[in-house]
Amino acid sequence: MNRSDIFEKLANLEANINQINSDMGNLKKLTVEVIEENVALQIENENLKTLIDKEEKSKAVENGKKLPKKQPLRSKDNLAMLYKEGFHICNGELFGKHRKGDDCLFCLEVLSE
């Protein structure tokens, strides 16, 4: 094997490594987007459950019926779990976005309320 063949193989290997690195970066971004969407949907689901419970309670009051006791929603626990998993729980445009390991004072304020 001569020098030009070795250099060509090395250049091809470098190009392949760069392509794999680029693909890995794209997959990482896509994974973060999917996880953020999942968190947003989980939070929306919790909000909808709360809304449904309020509707059922108001209808029961109108009809004079008693509702069976349900366990209260653990909203704070859910928010704490999401924050621990690395997502913003503060109000605003960061809500549901990945924190990338940094603490957020706004999120901590939400948890302390």
Swiss-Prot record:
Superkingdom per UniProt: Bacteria
Record: residues binding Zn(2+): 88, 90, 104, 107
Swiss-Prot/TrEMBL cofactor(s): Zn(2+)
Pfam families: YabA
One Gene Ontology term, aspect cellular component: nucleoid
Cofactor binding comment, as recorded: Binds 1 zinc ion per subunit.
InterPro entries cross-referenced by the UniProt entry: YabA (IPR010377)
Record key words, sorted: Cytoplasm, DNA replication, DNA replication inhibitor, Metal-binding, Zinc
Alphabetical GO biological process terms: DNA replication
Compartments where found: Cytoplasm, Nucleoid
Subunit annotation: Homotetramer. Interacts with both DnaA and DnaN, acting as a bridge between these two proteins.
NCBIfam families the record matches: PRK13169.1-2
Family: Belongs to the YabA family.
Function (record text): Involved in control of chromosome replication initiation. Inhibits the cooperative binding of DnaA to the oriC region, thus negatively regulating initiation of chromosome replication. Inhibits the ability of DnaA-ATP to form a helix on DNA; does not disassemble preformed DnaA-DNA helices. Decreases the residence time of DnaA on the chromosome at its binding sites (oriC, replication forks and promoter-binding sites). Tethers DnaA to the replication machinery via the DNA polymerase beta sliding clamp subunit (dnaN).
Designated name of the protein: Replication initiation control protein YabA
Lineage, highest ranks first: Bacteria, Bacillati, Bacillota, Bacilli, Bacillales
Gene: yabA
